[in-house]
């Protein structure tokens, strides 16, 4: 338990400004759309925020664990330090941390069903599933160039649209447009990180779009995402 707590503190310093903000903004947008249509509710809104935060922490733990196992967290890595690679936590403790955050996210998701209905069960299950498939398994999606697509889905359509749906039980064109824009903006953060890490990713076998198509194309994709979202 102590090791998990130490990991939470360490990862909080590393990730809180980036990934947790990225988890909060789409939910805020969904809440704003619901409020504009006169359907905002504080309790489901807070549950949506909590679910998003727990899923993001869970994804951070999962990525930290499996990237370490795959050898992606090299000594020459330029990005934020990772808990497993730095020896802040044992692999067994990280497994327990993943299990704990997954369980807590499922509990919060179950509470959300009282407001959304059973139709949100597949969405919650997909959130859990793809949190693992991103870096785990025989075909880790982040290692095969699918990261950008997943960001647009799980930082756009899912948090924006589902937050709105939980309160309004509806889906509008405004929600669709806002979801796409939000997902593309947050994907620029992934694109920047992949551009920064392109040499290390190539050595580690992580074939992001920047690695596959080159640095020049990566810069153009970043520009396209920003302009299209605007």
List each language-model region with its residue ranges.
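Solvent-exposed interhelical
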Residues: 62-102, 186-226
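Alpha-helical transmembrane segments of multipass membrane proteins
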Residues: 26, 51, 55, 59, ...
């Amino acid at each position: 338990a102590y090791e998990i707590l130490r990991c939470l503190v360490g990862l909080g310093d590393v990730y809180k400004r980036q990934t947790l903000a990225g988890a909060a903004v789409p939910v805020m947008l969904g809440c704003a759309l619901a409020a504009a249509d006169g359907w905002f509710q504080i309790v489901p809104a807070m549950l949506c925020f909590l679910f998003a935060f727990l899923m993001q922490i869970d994804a951070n733990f999962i990525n930290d664990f499996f990237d370490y196992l795959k050898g992606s967290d090299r000594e020459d890595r330029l990005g934020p330090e990772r808990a497993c690679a730095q020896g802040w936590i044992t692999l067994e403790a990280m497994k327990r941390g993943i299990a704990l955050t997954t369980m807590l996210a499922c509990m919060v998701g179950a509470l959300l069903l009282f407001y959304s209905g059973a139709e949100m069960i597949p969405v919650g299950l997909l959130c859990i599933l793809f949190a693992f498939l991103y870096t785990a398994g025989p075909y880790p999606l982040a290692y095969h160039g699918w990261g950008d697509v997943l960001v647009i889905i799980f930082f756009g359509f899912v948090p924006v649209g589902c937050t709105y749906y939980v309160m309004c039980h509806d889906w509008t064109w405004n929600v669709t447009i806002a979801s796409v824009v939000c997902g593309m903006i947050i994907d620029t953060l992934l694109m920047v990180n992949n551009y920064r890490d392109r040499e290390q990713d190539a050595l580690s076998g992580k074939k992001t779009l920047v690695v596959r198509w080159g640095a020049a194309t990566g810069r153009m994709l970043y520009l396209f995402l920003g302009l299209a979202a605007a």
